[in-house]
Amino acid sequence: MPLLRFDLIEGRDQSSLKKLLDVAHNVVVEAFDVPQQDRYQIVHEHPENHMIIEDTGLGFNRTKNLVVLSVTSKSRPEEKKQKFYRLLAERLESECGIASTDLIVSIVENDNADWSFGLGEAQFLTGKL
């Protein structure tokens, strides 16, 4: 059950935003083997001057299509992470027109005790999930 948080520069139309979210979800399902109905996505839109993303030495020129994606998830093997990064970059470029140089991804790992879906319980620990 990965939680995806998207930080975007404001101004995308609803159709483009929906496509971005759908593509990201389909990649999570494929790369991380999660069920199709496990969809947890949050979008934060910011004025352009509120996202200061400078060059990390790779020579990229970022555009207003910038996507900064934070994924909170249980630990996964490096191969699955690499597959996720690759598929996401490929599909966002081919299906959404977002250059792979406009994609930044960070994965933060946690454990079953770190999730509660309500009722004051950690459902992964209680066996309800």
UniProtKB/Swiss-Prot annotation:
Catalytic residues (UniProt): P2 (proton acceptor)
EC number: 5.3.2.-
Highest taxon of the lineage: Bacteria
A Gene Ontology molecular function term of the record: isomerase activity
Name of a matching Pfam family: Tautomerase_2
Disulfide links within the chain: none
UniProt cross-references to SUPFAM superfamilies, sorted A to Z: Tautomerase/MIF
Keywords: Isomerase
Function description: Putative target of GltR.
Homology family: Belongs to the 4-oxalocrotonate tautomerase family.
Protein name: Probable tautomerase YrdN
Species classification: Bacteria, Bacillati, Bacillota, Bacilli, Bacillales
